[in-house]
Amino acid sequence: MKILKNLGSLAFVLLIAGSLQAGGHASSLKWYSDGGVDLITFEDKEVIHLSKEQLGSYFGKGKQPYKGKKIAITVNNSGPKGGISGPLHRLRPAWEELTGAKLEIVEMPLAEQLSKTMFDLRLGSNQYDGFIEGAWYMGEYVTPGYIIPVDKYIADPGFPQWDPDWFPPSLREIHQWNGEFYAVLNDSDGQVLYWRQDILGSKEWQTRYKQDTGKEMPQPPKTWRDVIDIAKYFDGKNWDDNDAEEDDGVVMHFRVNEQGMFHFMSLSAAFTVMGGDTVDRGTNNYWFDPATMEPLINQPGHGRALETLYELSQYGPAAQSAWDLGTAWDWFLRGKSIFVFSWGDVGSLVQDESRSKIKGKLGASVLPGSYEVYDMNNNRWVKLDKPNVAGNTTGGSWQGVISAKSKNPEVVYSLYALMATQPVSMWNVNRGWTGVDPGVKIHFLPPVGSASVLGYIKEGFHESDLMYYLDAYHKNFFADKMLPYLRINGTEEYWRALDQNLSETMIGRMQPKEALDRTYKEWNEITERRGKAKQLKQYQEAVGYKN
């Protein structure tokens, strides 16, 4: 049995509760004389220790403040040990014993979750008390008043304790709406570049690369052109000794409705996002012209980005156009590609030797940049002395929100808050299968955070992998420029159109320009159908545009 303690030393105290509940059922809690408690996870029997202060004053041995109540929470259909849904299953018995309430976990396919929950809310069936949502759903939920702010619960010391000040500004923003918190800390999504450090850092391979290409191998890659050149060089070579087959330069995934379009968003920021102290068409902006709501998706910067993505994809497995996320990850974990750029799950999954062959061989960095960025204000390419690098919060940052129709909002919040406490959050980020990624202060190392190298190593991390991993994510979430996050009404529709057209490009049915021109047309149609004036007002508020 693995015991997780709060980072830092923790004195052992007298165990005062037995391992059985009344009635002889195995308990999921073990209480201590100081008011602390061990949460025992379902099936795995791992132990997460919370102090009395972390637990909150409403909860304690024998209290069960919500006895007899029941809540239903929707989440992605990943199963009892899958991403995002798995932690709910693993912590449900402990939470139920702690609160006295019952939790129904309602799993839904990613492509159906927003439509099903919105249908329920509009119809007034009120089947669900809360949603573990992708951050891009928030506009759909907030603007009609379907979810409630949680600031008053956060400030209440009775609930399990977590601190919004842990957030970097980039992540704080996507948990709030108009300055109020609607979502609770859970997952921190952003994409970084991963590579095989044992290969790219090898003097033998560096020498061979220079002999064969006449150039030094960039280490780490600074631009997307560097990534393409290196991927091209290694593609088709058997550079990894895990098998006798040829290996690839990169791996991605592009199956429709499997989040493949996020590859394009993250990569394209280097060619499109220009920083500054304002927001306008070409500054700190990406999606639409904030003065007119004209889509910018087919601008030259976006076009070059898609051409770059397509070129890079040629140095990966031919089948990746039909792959889902997990299949692409496993290709990298098996040692079959030099590069993958993806979410934080990869860094922790690399440590799982039942799934990974590359523990101790990982490199990672903030996503590469471009020496040219397209200025959408002046309609020209700008050449730079240093690569244009932008951070991102690409992905779902899957977060708990509470239905305004719930009769038990405080019960829902108690579940979310428990998941957000430092011990539970650290338990999550140390296990790649949970889908919960690092991104806040408690996950980073001093002097920028409060976690410890030893704590991660005890949980199975290789120290070299860890240092690359956390440095990449800190630089990503605290980057000077960030890819703006789209959360307005219709985001799901806008992104679905982009996803489908990108897939057509990746399988060779459509040229990049045609794909983005079609997306431009479809985005205009979505905007008109939803009401251009309303969409424009919401977009202006979302990006901070001042007319």
Regions found by a protein language model. Give the residues of each.
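Hinge/lid segment of periplasmic solute-binding proteins
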Residues: 29-65, 135-192, 243, 363-367, ...
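C-terminal lobe and pocket-closing loops
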Residues: 31-50, 58, 62-65, 348-357, ...
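Short, polar/charged alpha-helical segment
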Residues: 56-62, 80-100, 194, 198, ...
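Short, well-ordered beta-strand elements
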Residues: 67-80, 101-106, 129-130
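Extracytoplasmic "Venus flytrap"/periplasmic binding protein-like
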Residues: 90-169, 174-183, 202-204, 208, ...
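Short helix-initiation/N-cap motifs at beta->coil->alpha
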Residues: 107-116, 222-226, 320-334
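Extracytoplasmic/periplasmic solute-binding protein
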Residues: 176-187, 191, 225-290
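Glycine-centered hinge/linker elements that transmit conformational signals in sensory
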Residues: 226-231, 273-322, 363-372
